Amino acid sequence: MAGIARLPESVANKISAGEVVQRPVSVVKELLENAIDAGADRISVIISDAGKELVRIVDNGCGMERDDALLSVERFATSKIRGVEDLEDLSSLGFRGEALASISSVSHFELRTAVEGSPLALSFRYEGGVLVEEARVQGERGTSISVRNLFYNVPARRKFLKSNATEYGHIYELVRSFVLACPEISWQMVNDGEELFNFRTPDLNERLDFFYGSGFAESLVPVTEENDYISIRGFIGRPALQKRRRLDQYFFINRRLVQNRMLSQALQQAYGELLVERQAPFALLFFEMDPSRIDVNVHPAKLEVRFEDERSVRNMFYPVIKRAVRSYDFSPDLASGELPPLSTRYPSPSPIAFQDVAEPAVTKGELYRNYREGAFSTSRPQDNLPEGFQEQLFSPPEPPAGFVGTASLAGSGGNEDEVPLGDAVAEVKIWQLHNKYLICQIKTGLMIIDQHVAHERVLYERAVDVMETSVPNSQQLLFPQKVELRPWDWEIFEEIRDDLYRLGFNLSLFGSRTVMIEGVPQDVRPGSEVSILQDMIAEYSENASKLKLEKRDNLAKSYSCRNAIMTGQKLSLQEMRSLIDSLFATRDPYCCPHGRPVIIKMTLGQLDHMFGRK
């Protein structure tokens, strides 16, 4: 066996570089943090070949004198801290003093820097961590660092880099996060010779609209909270802006971009049922707190932080988001284009094919982490709709017995000025479209309701209330129905048997794995008793395997989904009115228990625009 030997410094540097510099985006992150710490108010990011060939960061920060510049490329040399106690009061983004040493050891590295008043800039060129050239060149105050041929001397690491599209995507997403986090800084980005953006003003709305599409900033919900412990400010997105990934969730703690599972989960749970399964809301949130209450020295790439009291942070953060979510009408706006998921806009030059970027696979663990908070949560809202909501929604407060239907509408040949929209309206106009949607005339235009998901919402909240009060609302069957369950279904039945009784099912055992249905909830359609029970068990099992739902919440969702009015079912006028009245008596009429929208509204102004009247 070979004896133990100390590794040469050049080898040790390459090994340690693997912790800090994992891919081109790691280089960009470290250099951007240094530029911000240097007090720059103008930063340029220039990359070539997705960062494999070139990463150059140019800033107009304070610059460095010669001795400091040489020390900056040495391991564990930094201006940010002097002792371990400084880690408890850290205000800078960088602090370890190993980034430049790690980067220079695996690349062709050039540093140019100049301080205020210096006639010339200093230039230092390194290859594999070794200084090979020093010179004085023309240059302005600030620092420019060029990293070429990344991992040229570590072929194993270079071989495992992903496609240009993937590596470029990581870089773009990182730069975007800094651009949004630091609106006081002017940002420029150039990729393969093409300028992607150049923000010269601190207008955050301009940046949001550029990255996510025109009008995006106006659709966001502001978040503001401040106390002696923590300050929270920023924006969250409407449910219609949700994504299948969390790349558009930005958490900045004391200006540091971090990843934190607790914050992501609390954000997800605050939205509750407004989110479709496995979707994540947009968030751009800034936290300010005493640096001594957080530990940033957790992850080599400084991507994670540890809170001194994580529970207190969550208990402050969750209600803030919950209040913001509840304070807005989240029914989708048809003309705003909210219904389709809003795709992130990646300006890209022709050589890079973004269609090659695959969505990250969703693991079972992520599904459990991303579960939506159900109605049985102790923190769920108990408030009803705002006072006077229905009076504002429908033109007349009470519909009369007579109803003018589609025939009358089709037969009216008057112009728009003859359409009564004020006090002259004598009834609520309701039509069923293709036995699928309900169309209602409202003061501002029209409202479209999905009859299936609307009934789901009604049944879900009824089930929740019934099981919480333990007062079953059951109707007895004249002829009991017999159901034989498969072994795996029987196990589910045994698990939810007591809650089925609370829901209104009166069940008795009849031999091995056989159940007699003697009574059902009053909402169950006659003749569907057996299929409803079987479908509920199947739905409950599927939800349990995919999502982390509380047992009663899962049962209520399964019951409402399987028992709701189906698409294609014709409704009478009275049934439509009853459904709408029941919907707006629920706590949350805007989405079904699974997160799909229930209501879409169109204003007269939007219709006028579509018909060229405006």
UniProtKB/Swiss-Prot annotation:
Gene3D superfamilies: 3.30.230.10, Histidine kinase-like ATPase, C-terminal domain, MutL, C-terminal domain, dimerisation subdomain, MutL, C-terminal domain, regulatory subdomain. CDD domains: HATPase_MutL-MLH-PMS-like, MutL_Trans. Keywords: DNA damage, DNA repair. GO terms for molecular function: ATP binding; ATP hydrolysis activity; ATP-dependent DNA damage sensor activity; mismatched DNA binding. One of its GO terms (cellular component) is mismatch repair complex. InterPro entries: DNA_mismatch_repair_CS, DNA_mismatch_repair_MutL, DNA_mismatch_S5_2-like, HATPase_C_sf, MutL/Mlh/PMS, MutL/Mlh/Pms-like, MutL_C, MutL_C_dimsub. Pfam families: DNA_mis_repair (PF01119), HATPase_c_3 (PF13589), MutL_C (PF08676). PROSITE patterns: DNA_MISMATCH_REPAIR_1. GO terms for biological process: mismatch repair. This protein is involved in the repair of mismatches in DNA. It is required for dam-dependent methyl-directed DNA mismatch repair. May act as a 'molecular matchmaker', a protein that promotes the formation of a stable complex between two or more DNA-binding proteins in an ATP-dependent manner without itself being part of a final effector complex. NCBIfam families: mutl (TIGR00585). Belongs to the DNA mismatch repair MutL/HexB family. This is DNA mismatch repair protein MutL. It comes from Chlorobium phaeovibrioides (strain DSM 265 / 1930) (Prosthecochloris vibrioformis (strain DSM 265)).
